[in-house]
Amino acid sequence: MKHSTLALLLLVLALPASAAPDYSRLGKDLTPIGAERAGNADGTIPAWEGGLTEPPPGWTPEQGYVDPFPDDEPLFTITGENAAQYESKLTAGQVEMLRKFPEFRMNVYPTRRTAALPKAVTDRVRERAGQVRLESFGLKDLGGSTTPFPIPQNGLEVVWNHLVRYLGGGVIGAGHSFPVRASGDYYKIGFRAMRIYSENMDKPEPNRLFYALGYFTEPATLRGTIFLVHEPVDQVAEQRSAWIYNAGARRVRRAPDLNYDGVNDGSEGMFVTDQVDGYNGAPDRFEWKLLGKREVYVPYNTYKLGDKSIKYKDIIQKRTINPELVRYELHRVWVVEGTLKQGQRHIYGKRSFYIDEDSWTVVAEDAYDTRGGLWRFAQHGIMQCYDAVLPCYRFGIFHDLTNGAYFVGGLDNEIREPRQYNAKGRIADFQPDALRRLGGTL
């Protein structure tokens, strides 16, 4: 929870600003949530044919998300030596990683457009298309849509599509994260979290998107620290509310740093609060510019990394995770550039987000310091959670391009408990007073 300018902008498929959205295209030449159904001209991106909606035969949740494509082989590998020939399909952060760190390479596999959502979810997107609106940087009249702007007209609309994307109504799960220093030394952080959306609460409250509660399970210095977030929909009318329970002091306090560029426990300062989940929180501190669409090699269908037979010691390496375990595919992504507004505060002066067209999920971020230098690079490997019928993150990794340190989170190879989607919640369990009760049991 607590956690450049683009080198080349080829294959830009930006929607003309003057074109009014034609929502009748949804489910026709566009997918139900607005991606281009057709493949690309040279056949390296196939047409979308409904995505992956069933688990492999014989699958059980205790196995974790096993790879439904075990026989796929890499088509080629991008390294620092051959990166120039692929640069038009790389992010600035990928180019810099390839240039600086020979340990980083990218195995590129055939593209499989596995993203899919339940029909009831996509039906609601279509019903609400054209009715949701922006007011300043906030969202109005969401009405249960999880893709408020399926044919986006500006960068802020794309950002909001990511922020409210469908994540199963509620999810409970545990994971391990690893801060990895430039020397290669690392340690393990355990965290358990639940995020319950308003519609899955026993007593839904107005203007509430979700409730999140999480706590550290290890190391001992962090164990028992609990976080609570109430996330609003309309962030003009109401800001995020957050609290923290400190196990040592046994008290609950407000947590204003659980927002924007706050640096939180367990992060080692390698990422900031609004980078969790690709991007989260109020988008009001940046001016958002839609640069269009690009074809980019991004971590996709990254099931192999979560194989329960693979131990963390086989994943964590110096300067990056084991590249043999990461699958890259060519996908169309929306590119949105955020520039820090005059008079606002944030450690990043500019950031470029790459958002998968099939799922509205942030899959990469180039982050620049306030002097304009490329500072950090994040990648978020996604996969289709076929039992819940939704795209979800397999891992998130934050690279410091200045020194080779990184932070990787979201791993659960050595955890037996499966994720639980469509989880329900009680409002009473997501109140500040409940943190003390929970803290006494940890």
Residue spans of the language-model regions?
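Sec-dependent signal peptide recognition
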Residues: 2-9
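N-terminal signal peptide c-region/cleavage motif recognized by signal peptidases
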Residues: 14-17
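Gly/Pro-enriched, hydrophobic low-complexity segments
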Residues: 23-50, 78, 91, 213-281, ...
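Solvent-exposed N-terminal domain segments of exported/luminal and surface proteins
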Residues: 23-240, 246
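Extended beta-strand-rich segments in extracellular/periplasmic secretory proteins, especially
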Residues: 175-182, 186-218, 222, 276-353, ...
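Long, C-terminal catalytic modules of enzymes
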Residues: 414-442
